[in-house]
């Protein structure tokens, strides 16, 4: 089987094909430049991230796809999963600017920090109430890529934990205070991650 490996990093988006254990067809493209970088806010157009990822991946024939992404980034979407914000990078510091301080317990698997997505969402709630009022769904970068391919907002628990919204002990997601108040990040007990199967633009491959 041919496995397509994609790593969406902060500097480059990297690709490789694993076939029988050997890596081939390696390629990389620069991660899109930020649309906003003012020393506090660091935002990237999500459409540009998807376009760069799929432009190369669509040319590669594979049986399935493995995706890793930078963590601590997120975006908010409306009731139809349409983005309300750009991708807000781990380099964003709006929570510090808004003086957000949250109690983040050990069960979250992370700690309070300026780039914690949960703290960033709280900053948006305080500073942009009109935008927050429209928010119905929270995505990590990984879960938005999965949604683009499968229609499901799903990610691995390691990505979920980095958001600050996940209880790693009970494997449950916390309310994001967005409209739906439903579980937006999923894991399957027993193998520590999300089991997702769908068909998308990656050559009809299986995710």
Report residues per predicted region.
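N-terminal glycine/serine-rich phosphate-binding loop of ATP-dependent small-molecule kinases
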Residues: 1-86, 134, 183-186
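Glycine-rich phosphate-binding/catalytic subdomain of phosphoryl-transfer
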Residues: 55-207
């Amino acid at each position: 089987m041919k496995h397509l490996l994609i790593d969406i990093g902060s500097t480059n988006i990297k690709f490789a094909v694993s076939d029988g254990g050997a890596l081939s067809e390696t390629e990389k493209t620069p991660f899109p430049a930020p649309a906003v970088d003012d020393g506090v806010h660091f935002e990237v157009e999500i459409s540009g991230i998807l376009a760069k990822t799929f432009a190369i991946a669509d040319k590669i024939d594979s049986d399935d796809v493995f995706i890793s992404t930078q963590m601590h980034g997120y975006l908010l979407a409306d009731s139809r999963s349409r983005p309300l914000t750009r991708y807000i990078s781990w380099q964003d510091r709006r929570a510090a600017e808004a003086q957000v301080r949250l109690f983040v317990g050990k069960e979250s698997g992370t700690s309070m920090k300026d780039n914690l997505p949960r703290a960033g969402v709280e900053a948006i709630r305080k500073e942009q109430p009109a935008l927050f009022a429209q928010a119905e769904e929270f995505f990590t970068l990984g879960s938005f890529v999965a949604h683009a391919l499968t229609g499901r907002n799903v990610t691995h628990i390691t990505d979920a934990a980095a958001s600050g919204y996940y209880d790693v002990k009970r494997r449950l997601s916390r309310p994001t205070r967005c409209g739906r108040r439903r579980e937006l990040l999923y894991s399957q007990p027993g193998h520590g991650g999300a089991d997702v199967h769908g068909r998308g633009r990656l050559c009809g491959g299986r995710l």
